[in-house]
Amino acid sequence: GSVLLFGSCSILLNVFQIGYSTILIHCKSSVEIVFPSVGILFICTQAYFLWHHSKDCIQVQHNFTRCGLMLTIATNLLLWLLAVTNDTLHMEIESQLREVEQRFAGKAPSSHPHWCNETTLCTCPNTTICKVFQKGYILLYPFNTEYCLVCSSVLYVMWKNVGRRISHHHTPHTKPKFKLQGVVFGPLLGTSAVIIGACVFMMYQIQATSLVPSRQVFVIYYSYYIVLLPLMSVGAVIGTIIHALEKKELDTLKNPTRSLDVVLLMGAALGQIGMSYFSIVALVATDPRDRLNSLALSYSVLLIFQNITQNVFVIDGLHRQRLTPPGKEEDTKEEQNREANSQRRVSVLELGQEIRKASLSYIQIYSHLSWKRRVLREISFFLVLCNIILWIMPTFGAHPLFENGMERSFYGYSTWFVIVNFGLPLGVFYRMHSVGGLLEVYVTA
């Protein structure tokens, strides 16, 4: 599913890039039109291949298959590295902003001949279609890097499964189904965090992307994170302590998928941790006593701590053995009830009785769950919703680390652009992957 989602966004990104380069064909190379066209073919072919063969354990031509998969992984990593370091369009936009600032200041735009010769001559004209292509390209840019990372992960699992044989006596674990039962406070707190985060995000998008961004919107943005991140960290620490108090044994069986999940969680967290580290260095070296700088500094420190505590909680939960027997009995009872309900027509009176029975059963399940399992479910669901809003905000254009200008002025445009473009896609991928891990912890609690 994620391959198709991010693949579709990557195709749309390439379409915007082709349209943008076509409008500026007088100063753009034809390679900038051919390359995204070939990229669309590659994305479609790869998505089709992964959709139909991602779960196959190939038993023929082992060496040839491994070589092809490793070549495809290397191609995706190269495309990811190219996307991280390619700042052509962003430099053009920066050139336009500098020119506008110079005009407002009453200076001639030709005061920087290097910018005029290379970028100012190749700027987007004041047409709606060009602005649409430009804005769409910038908004969809992180999806392309995520697509490369997701495909590399799936291809690596396929590479590990080449030649793998599953014994006939092996009985695979039946994954428990997701049920919103036994949780009350987690969904309430998580929904509140999502609603407030959506309001902060809309305010940020309106004010921070203007010609002269307001400092107040950055204060609101950082304040939201400074309140939310400690709550998430405390929840993860409490969940880890409950895992330690549980009597569940650790699942020590070899599991390639779980091992990959752990590696991806730890590796993707390095993106946000790295950006936060460089941000801390820049803020401490400049003026940490300034209000906005102190908020950004607190945000970076709390983000590092939250990533570490959440990783410990999720990884510990993934290694706990599942309690299968009660789950199986509940599943069989529910299936029997569904079959019985589908065989008869429900009248208005019966519908009221069914609703009352459902509410009573929900209360019984909530009361029968042990307090440890109940708290784990509440924490897991709360963290799922928090990670969703923290995934949405940077994915759709909230990048305060790049737009507030503090770190950019310290490191320089090109250096900070590479740091952000390296860490931001990993951070977005981390939030998305954390949702999957937390849902598994919730289901198996």
Residue ranges of model-derived segments:
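Non-transmembrane, juxtamembrane loop and terminal tail segments
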Residues: 104, 167-181, 188, 323-374
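Extracellular/lumenal N-termini and interhelical loops of multi-pass eukaryotic membrane proteins
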Residues: 76-138, 387-414, 418
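Transmembrane alpha-helices of multi-pass eukaryotic membrane proteins
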Residues: 1-6, 27-42, 62-72, 133-148, ...
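Membrane-proximal N-terminal segments immediately preceding the first transmembrane helix
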Residues: 51, 113-129, 162-177, 197-213, ...
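Extended alpha-helical "rod" scaffolds
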Residues: 310-311, 317, 361-364, 372-379, ...
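Membrane-lumen (extracellular) interface motif
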Residues: 14-35, 51-62, 84-94, 197-225, ...
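Membrane-embedded alpha-helical transmembrane segments of multi-pass integral membrane proteins
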Residues: 6-16, 38, 42-52, 75-82, ...
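Transmembrane-helix exit/juxtamembrane "anchor" motif
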Residues: 48-55, 151-167, 205, 235-251, ...
